Amino acid sequence: MEVLCDSKGTNVCPSGGVGVYNPGYWGMNIERRKSYKVSLHIRSSDAVSLSVSLRSSDGLQKLACHTITGGKKQFTNWTKIEFHLKSSINNTNSRLQFTTTKTGVIWLDQVSVMPSDTYMGHGFRKDLASMLADLKPQFLKFPGGNYAMGNYLRNAFQWGETVGPWEERPGHFNDAWGYWTDDGLGFFEFLQLAEDLGASPVWVVNDGASANEEVSTSRIASLVKDVVDGIEFARGGPKTTWGSVRAAMGHPQPFKLDYVAIGNQECWMLYYRGNYQKFYSAIKASYPDINIVSSCDKSTISPSNPADLYDVHVYASSANMFSRSSMFDNTPRSGPKAIVSEYAVTGNDAGKGTLVAALAEAAFLVGLEKNSDVVEMASCAPLFVNDNDRRWSPDAIVFNSWQHYGCPNYWMLHFFKDSSGATFHPTAMQISNYDQMVASAITWQNPKDKSTYLKIKVVNFGNKGVDLNITITGLGNAIKSSGSKKTVLTSSAPLDENSFQQPEKVTPVSSLLADAKQQMGVSVSSYSLTSFDLLLEPSKHSTI
């Protein structure tokens, strides 16, 4: 910025000085007594006296301030400066402001304000990352689908340009979704987040295709090498070429990386299969243990076109999604498993995240549970959305600079977070003239107290309540009469949604289940997801 006024002389600066400010993304949430790290690069050939402050959105209220001073030669070269600011009050719509009363030219670059209490100390908002962690995710697919490919290859995610010091990353235009990213959330940060969550990273790599372009198989070699280099960055020793870059970023031990997905929905494109085989052969030659995911369906996979997993994306109306509970029932039981890496209810009744959409997705997941011998894993898409910049609906978690809430489908996922590693049990449902219900049963162990539960989930997608008689065989006296509970996700209307004004309008409600036993009558509300968690004696199994 060029400052033409001064503290004295004929052109005196106004009270408080002149300068620039940045509100961040729709305002910064500054909390009382919390410490915020400010990082910036500065250059100037003039003497500098620069006030850096956190202020209210109108600039009238000062929350915290720090002054950068230096002689005429101190900042001739780019200089990195870091300091902390601590506010004495709360303000959910703040801005970062730079002001001075000294004439001269000041260059600023790579300016950042970050709270000191991020999730695991790695930069993610603690409240949002904790919501994700509460789901006990088993894998994290990144950096995305269309985001990884781009509308044009020049705007695709290039992992090598997203590692190293943040200020040295060039950033890129995410033309798939229409915004610029500085790539502060890069390859390293995704791997770190997966590690912090205890989840397996699933890296989606560009296969030489974008929405409008495609690299021929004869010219794919450099992109193949780039992916192999990326795996070395994640898994290589600290003295390898790319492993040393990771080590310099503070993670000398290799990351876990067991899954690589080749492309995103490009099976139909001219060169996909030829390019895929080049990626497959090169990755397996160096890392034979990595599971490679194909964008083609199971029918295309053969010894000459191998894959460890195949990717499935499901977007449908709520009624259609409910019917897909049986989607994998007739899938051949041999060969590679599916990874349903994207699924969501879309359309009019999806809204911004309705109850009925969540119930349809629950029914779909019940079907995946029943077919877990042919389905490896599944994830909803998208996961997060900033309410100020919605590009897609619905999403599981909505946030702004200071608030967040889970949509009904987020709370629905809590009913399935104990399914990984659980034992599945067959179920049979007999209801006359009513086809709007599906159910599943698993046994799972609470890791905190090692108690074992039989979890029976029932999805009622219809508009009438149902009384059920549950009969459990093969347990004997294994169900304890106390310690069981019933949890219900429902609301007064199927199109109900959560919001910042009513963040818990559609959330699970739990109650003790009195006198749980092998045979019991239960009531299931219309438009509901109900879970019966029955506390068991150790080492018992069942047929339901």
Across the structure, where does each feature detected by a protein language model lie?
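Active-site mouth of glycoside hydrolases
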Residues: 73-76, 91, 152, 157, ...
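The substrate-binding groove and active-site-proximal loops of carbohydrate-active enzymes
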Residues: 112-122, 167-184, 206-221, 258-273, ...
